[in-house]
Each structure stands twice: as structure tokens, then as C-alpha cells.
Swiss-Prot record:
Gene designation: neoN
Domain Radical SAM core: 10-222
UniProt entry tagged with the keyword S-adenosyl-L-methionine: yes
Reaction(s) the record says it catalyses: neomycin C + AH2 + S-adenosyl-L-methionine = neomycin B + 5'-deoxyadenosine + L-methionine + A + H(+)
Keywords: 4Fe-4S, Antibiotic biosynthesis, Iron, Iron-sulfur, Isomerase, Metal-binding, S-adenosyl-L-methionine
Annotated SUPFAM superfamilies: Radical SAM enzymes (SSF102114)
GO MF annotation list: 4 iron, 4 sulfur cluster binding; isomerase activity; metal ion binding
Cofactor note: Binds 2 [4Fe-4S] clusters. One cluster is coordinated with 3 cysteines and an exchangeable S-adenosyl-L-methionine. The second cluster is proposed to be involved in the electron-transfer mechanism for the catalytic cycle.
Binding annotation for [4Fe-4S] cluster 1: C26, C30, C33
Naturally occurring in which organism (per UniProt): Streptomyces fradiae
Binding site for [4Fe-4S] cluster 2: C226, C247, C271, C274
Name by which UniProt lists this protein: Neomycin C epimerase
PROSITE patterns named among the record's database cross-references: MOAA_NIFB_PQQE, RADICAL_SAM
GO biological process, one term: antibiotic biosynthetic process
Length: 299
């Protein structure tokens, strides 16, 4: 018997992940969010964004750009992100979707992630969204294949499954990412969502994600390493000021936050009890480098 040996063996390559959070106000009042009043200097913020982009080769990184509030309230910033995306940078924008469909106009090169807690007003009770707003978000997500980020705060599983079924029936081809209402200051999670209770769908996170969530809920401890730690880094932008940190989880020690410069790697990051969208980041389609193209460093 002969066996064909392929050499070198196929390797799935992924981009680096860089999360950029800019200052911003918000136009909704989620009961689980901490919103601070702030004045945003858009030209200064754009200069800081360009300093960050200059550190990387286009298409070698997936940038996730979001705001402490709602980024589409700052059109000059989003327009600049579109410009950089058109130049070859891979940029996804996290939005609460309240400015749809206008927020999409003239920005064809951006990737989108929309925050919505389900398909009904009841599921979005903590966000205060009305049904027409929810419908516009889901319409855009289905049309664009945009990712959906859903906070699970205790909605009935029957409603969660109805949400999954609706997206399945509409041919949704993005990623539906459930994340628990975070526990502040390292306290154990207060909500649990089990994979075996959910209707199967290709757009859900893998079963291992939910197993990790269940473990943290039951024990108050982690037993696995998040992809943010293996392949991610965070930038916090406030006008001309840029701060950096490996992960911006709640209660991160202040001495681990540093000024703009080289990234710092850690053998033992002090993870708390959070679990969020970065957990299986490397498995996302947006993170994958196309087959047959291997970016090599300049030497």
C-alpha cells in the first residue's frame, strides 16, 4: 500500500489580530454598559489610527475598530477607515447598528460586526432597541454576511433558538457570537448557555467555546487559553494618545498597560473570568490568509 506524502504539509495561516478602541459617546443606554461622556477629537484620532496602521503590512492583520460608545457617530473616523481598507488593510468595524443603512453608504471595503441581543424587542430589553431598528440590523447582517455579537443576559433558551432559526431560514452566512454578560472585577459569571440546548447551525461558535463558558460559570476559573492571548493585542486611542495592552479584559492591572511602541508578550497573563468574541478568534474566516499566498518578512 502506498501513501501519498505531501510536503511541506498544508498549514492554515491566520492574520494577526489587533483591536483598536477609540473614545466615543453612545446613542443608546444599555443597562450593562458603562458609558462616559467624552469629547472626541476626530482629526487627532485619525492621526493615531494612521500611526497604528503604519506598524503593519496591509492584509497581514485583521483590525477590529470600535468605540467606547458608537463609532458611526463619528463619520470622519469611519470614512478614514474605509480609505485605509480600500488601500488593502483588512478592517472590521463594530457598531450597534442604529445608523443603518446610512452607515454603510460609501464604505464598501469595510467588514462589519453588529451588536444586537436577539430578533425581538424583548430579547433587546437591556439595549432599548425598537423592532424596526432590530429588523434593519438583521437585514444588513444577512445581506452582507456581517457578524453578529449577542450578549446573553438570561433570555429564555426558546427565544434564543427562535433567533437561530430565523437566521438559518434567511440563509445567514456570517458568525453569530453569543457572549455572557461579563462579570465585573473577576466575579464568577452569572449566566450560562449550553451548546447542547441550542439548535444546530453552522454560524455558531464551536462546542468547545460553550464548554469553556460552562466551566467558568461552574468553577469561576479558566482552563484554556484564549486566542486573544496567543495572537491578539489591544490599542486604546484617546485623541493623540495611544495606550496598549495585551488584553483589555475587566480589572486588568494598570501596570500592564503601556505607551505606544512594540507589543509585549507574556508567559502568564492574569486572565479573569471573562469569555468573549476573541476566544476562538483564529478560527474566524476573516482571520484566514488565502491559500497559496504566504506573506514573508523582509530580511
Amino acid at each position: 500500500m502506498t501513501t501519498d506524502i505531501v510536503w511541506p504539509p498544508p498549514v492554515r495561516q491566520v492574520r494577526a489580530y489587533r483591536n483598536i478602541v477609540v473614545d466615543g459617546a453612545c446613542n443608546i443606554r444599555c443597562t450593562y454598559c458603562e458609558v462616559k461622556k467624552t469629547k472626541v477629537d476626530q482629526p487627532a484620532t485619525i492621526r493615531s489610527l494612521d500611526r497604528i496602521f503604519a506598524e503593519y503590512e496591509p492584509d497581514a492583520v485583521l483590525f477590529r475598530v470600535e468605540s467606547d460608545g458608537e463609532i458611526t457617530l463619528y463619520p470622519k473616523i469611519v470614512d478614514h477607515l474605509q480609505k485605509r481598507a480600500a488601500e488593502g488593510y483588512r478592517v472590521e468595524v463594530l457598531s450597534n447598528g442604529t445608523k443603518l443603512p446610512r452607515a454603510l453608504e460609501g464604505r464598501p471595503d469595510l467588514l462589519w460586526v453588529f451588536s444586537v441581543d436577539g430578533h425581538t424587542e424583548a430579547m433587546n430589553a437591556k439595549r432599548g432597541l425598537k423592532q424596526p431598528q432590530i429588523d434593519r440590523i438583521l437585514d444588513a447582517a444577512v445581506e452582507l454576511g456581517a457578524e453578529l455579537q449577542t450578549v446573553y443576559w438570561g433570555q429564555p433558551v426558546e427565544e434564543v433558538n427562535a433567533y437561530i432559526d430565523l437566521l438559518e431560514s434567511r440563509g445567514y452566512r456570517g458568525l453569530l457570537h453569543f457572549m455572557p454578560l461579563l462579570a465585573f472585577k473577576g466575579r464568577p459569571l452569572t449566566v450560562n448557555l449550553r451548546y447542547q440546548d441550542l439548535h444546530p447551525a453552522d454560524f455558531l461558535a464551536p462546542p468547545e467555546y460553550f464548554r469553556r463558558w460552562n466551566h467558568i460559570f461552574e468553577t469561576g476559573r479558566r482552563d484554556a487559553v484564549c486566542d486573544q492571548i496567543t495572537n491578539g493585542y489591544n490599542y486604546q486611542v484617546s485623541g493623540d494618545e495611544i495606550r496598549m495592552v495585551k488584553c483589555d479584559c475587566y480589572s486588568v492591572p494598570k501596570h500592564l498597560v503601556h505607551g505606544f511602541g512594540p507589543i509585549r508578550e507574556f508567559d502568564d497573563w492574569p486572565c479573569g473570568t471573562c469569555i468573549a468574541n476573541q476566544e476562538f478568534n483564529n478560527s474566524r474566516e476573516r482571520m484566514r490568509v488565502p491559500q497559496g499566498r504566504i506573506p514573508l518578512p523582509l530580511v
